[in-house]
Regions:
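Sec/Tat signal peptide C-region and signal peptidase I cleavage site
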Residues: 16-22
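Short beta-strand and strand-turn-strand segments in soluble, beta-rich domains
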Residues: 36, 90-104
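Extracellular/periplasmic metallocenter environments
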Residues: 104-151
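Extracytoplasmic/periplasmic copper-protein system
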Residues: 23-32, 76-95, 137-151
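Cleavable N-terminal signal peptides
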Residues: 8-10, 20
Length: 151
């Protein structure tokens, strides 16, 4: 009986550990009408082949009035991406089309909406500095945070 109990415990622990590990590759981020992300820092284990960001707009205002997106790039590229996003404007989704500096980006969403983006981490270097930010109407001035691979 003890052997069965031990095996059940090992099996249960293995299943829950794998589930927890898989969830480390997915991060939930929120933003509202107050021009801020719910977290200033995102860390993804370096062992994740892909990372997923689930992005939710918790505010009430529509995308045309207070929309947000979630964009990931090297920190050094943040301002140039924002500058090009300003040129693209609302019609271009506040991002230059097919910008190779953008690692990942969500659609622009408004209050009550959600979106997600999944991207490969293989091209990311743990030694580089990365930032996530919102390019809508230069929100990146205050809406930004750091992104890192850990481990």
């Amino acid at each position: 009986m003890k052997t069965i109990t031990r095996l059940a415990l090992v099996f249960t622990t293995a299943i829950f550990s794998q589930a927890a590990f898989a969830n480390d590759c997915t991060v939930d981020v929120e933003a509202g009408d107050a021009l801020s992300f719910s977290t200033p820092k995102i860390e993804i284990p370096a062992s994740c082949a892909n990372a997923t960001i689930n992005f939710k707009h918790t505010g009430r205002l529509p995308a045309a009035a207070m929309g947000h997106n979630w964009v990931l790039a090297k920190t050094a590229d943040l301002q140039p991406i924002q500058n090009d996003g300003n040129v693209a404007g609302a019609a271009g989704g506040y991002l230059k089309a097919d910008d190779p500096r953008v690692i990942a980006a969500t659609a622009i969403i408004g209050g009550g909406e959600s979106t997600s983006v999944t991207f490969a981490t293989a091209g990311l270097d743990a030694g580089d500095a990365y930032s996530f930010f919102c390019t809508v109407m230069s929100h990146s001035v205050v809406m930004k945070g750091t992104f890192a691979l850990k481990g």
